[in-house]
Every structure is written in C-alpha cells, then in structure tokens.
Amino acid sequence: QECIRAKSPITAENAINIGITGGGVIDGSGDLWRPVKQFKLTDRQWEALMKKSQYTIDTKEGGIWMPTESSFKGNEHNIQLDAENALEKASEYYDFYRPVMVSLRHCKRILLDGVTFMNSPAWNIHPFFCKNLTVRNVTVSNPYYAQNGDGIDVESCKKVHIHNCTFETGDDAICLKSGKNAVARQIEGPCEDVYIHDCLVNKGHGGFVIGSEMSRGIKNVLVENCTFLGTDVGVRMK
C-alpha cells in the first residue's frame, strides 16, 4: 500500500542488473529521524536525548521523544496519502515521513554483497516487486531502540536468495511481506520462491518473520541453517 515517505537516499525503480557491493558502510543517520520510546532507554540515555530536542509525546507506555518540531507536528496531523493535496500539506512536516534507507522498486537482477547498512531512518532495505534478488555477505545494523528499524523487508518479490548475512536490528530482522488490506489485493503479486540460509540475527523482535502485511500471499519459502541469538521471537508468523 502506497504511503507518504521522504525520498529514500538510495533508490532504484524499473532498473535491471544493479548491484551495491564492496566492503563499505552506508549510514542512514537514523538518529536524526527516528522517534524513541522512553521505556527502551536508561534514564541517562533519555536525559541525553532531551538535551537535543524537547519535543515528546505522552503515551500509556511513557514518553516518545521526537527529534524535531517538524516530526512532532507531523505526528499530530498525520496526513495520509488519500487526503486532498496530501503531498503539499505533508511537505511542512517532512521529518515525520521517514524514508526507508534502500528502496528497490520493480527491479530485476539485483545483487547486494559485502556492504554494511546501518542506522536507517525506518526500514533498512525494502525490495518491492523485484525479481532475482541476491543478498549475501551483508551486515545490517540498527540500535536496539530503533523504531521500525527492520533489517530487510522483502515485499511481493520473486526468486530471492539471502545468505551469509548478519543482522542486529530494533525491529524484525528478515521479513517477508506482500501488501496490506483490500488495496493490495487489487494487484496480483505474492512473495514467492525465497531461499534464506546461513544467516545470523544477533538482536531483533523477530529473526525470520512473515507479515504482518501479506494480503497478496507468500509461498515457496525455505529457511535453514540460520542462528537467532538475541531475538524476542526466532520465527514469527503475524
């Protein structure tokens, strides 16, 4: 389901034969974007955040720190894509609409190899309706308190091979999705033919997760020889 987001710093759409490879580090400066829940931090960590920004939201779980005035007001207004003049209205609250760090949409023959992806504003890697995707020898790292800090969210993709990767995230590590609600079901596109093996998840909500957005279906998936050490749940079906 389409939604309002800031432009991803790394984006490809309708591209063929693309790769992000090598031993480098891609840092998304997520601390400048992400809200932080107070209960996930020590008192000293919370005090340090409050010196950077005084904007907070009160909830039953405690406070949520917002990094900027724009993100704080964006949360209040929460403009959705189906609103009249939505993009124009949302631009005033740009910081609220956190981007995924790597967005790959309708691409074919993709290789991610050897790179470290870290500190993303929202999800780290989001392949969407892609075909022939290989992710190997990749490290994905986010702080344990990173809100929506998923490792990789493979959505409605075909022929996916993820192996020998290491994840440490603030949310789900390896996640398969296929769209949300009736809007998603208008377009055929299950997530299918996925092979995941020899991956290590040091920390995260779920090590390997299906859902929660799965309206177009998920099929033909094999996960083996993976190690989940510090996850809340190893394998999770939402």
Predicted segment positions?
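Extracellular/periplasmic carbohydrate-active domains that bind, remodel
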Residues: 1-238
